[in-house]
């Protein structure tokens, strides 16, 4: 299968609630690489690379609200060029 990369911008109550940590856990379980980081506007950027079905599962998890402590209002997803990440990290 072909590797794909996406950037997802997650809006709502997603900072200070363990969102990046839980996203890292979910992405790692799906075998994805990339990162999650807080943005200045209160959203979280998730860049994920891997097999299309696994990336789709992460996007579905994000759209379904992520961790229970978060409240996701909307998720914008954009395709990205291939990138070579080692694992899935939290960026600061």
Curated annotation (Swiss-Prot):
DNA-binding recorded as keyword: no
Paired cysteines (S-S): none
Keyword Hydrolase listed: yes
Record-annotated active site: 20, 38
Domain Acylphosphatase-like residue range list: 5-92
Reaction(s) the record says it catalyses: an acyl phosphate + H2O = a carboxylate + phosphate + H(+)
Pfam (any one): Acylphosphatase
Xref: PANTHER family: ACYLPHOSPHATASE (PTHR47268:SF4)
Similarity annotation: Belongs to the acylphosphatase family.
Name of the molecule in the record: Acylphosphatase
Protein's organism: Serratia proteamaculans (strain 568)
Lineage per the UniProt record: Bacteria, Pseudomonadati, Pseudomonadota, Gammaproteobacteria, Enterobacterales
């Amino acid at each position: 299968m072909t590797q794909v990369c996406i950037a997802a911008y997650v809006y709502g109550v997603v900072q200070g609630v363990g969102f990046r940590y839980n996203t890292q856990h979910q992405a790692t379980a799906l075998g994805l690489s990339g990162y999650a980081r807080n943005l200045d506007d209160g959203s979280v950027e998730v860049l994920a690379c891997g097999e299309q079905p696994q990336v789709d599962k992460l996007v579905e998890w994000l759209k379904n609200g992520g961790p229970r402590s978060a409240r996701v209002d909307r998720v914008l997803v954009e395709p990205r060029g291939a990138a070579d990440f080692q694992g899935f990290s939290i960026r600061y």
